[in-house]
Amino acid sequence: MVTPSVGAIVLIPFPFSDLTNAKLRPAFVVAESGKDDWVCVQITSNPYADAEAIKIKESDFKTGSLQRVSYVRPGKLFTAGRIIFKRKIGMLADSKVDEIKESIINIIQSGK
């Protein structure tokens, strides 16, 4: 079990839509929500036509990295229990963390 922190990229199991299995995928840790639950955001390597997607590349990391250029999708928030966090991949630079948080706030305030 991993102890996450704000700004971390972690691997967690994302279930298939039919719930028969799950695949490990990266997620960005946004905030602690209490009782070992964390608010996270989806990360993908697919450049969706998502106007809010934020590109993350190797130079955006303080430590660690992803295998390829990826995209944080700030409109895809979810809560996950610490018990499902499998591995910490790295930490994003403070400036990138601030950019992602600002985007989440803008999405919430705009009502999108």
Predicted stretch roles:
Residues T63-K112:
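C-terminal terminal-subdomain/extension
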Residues D18-T20, R68:
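Coiled-coil-like amphipathic alpha-helices with heptad-repeat character
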Residues T20-K23, V29-K62:
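Compact nucleic-acid interaction/catalytic patches
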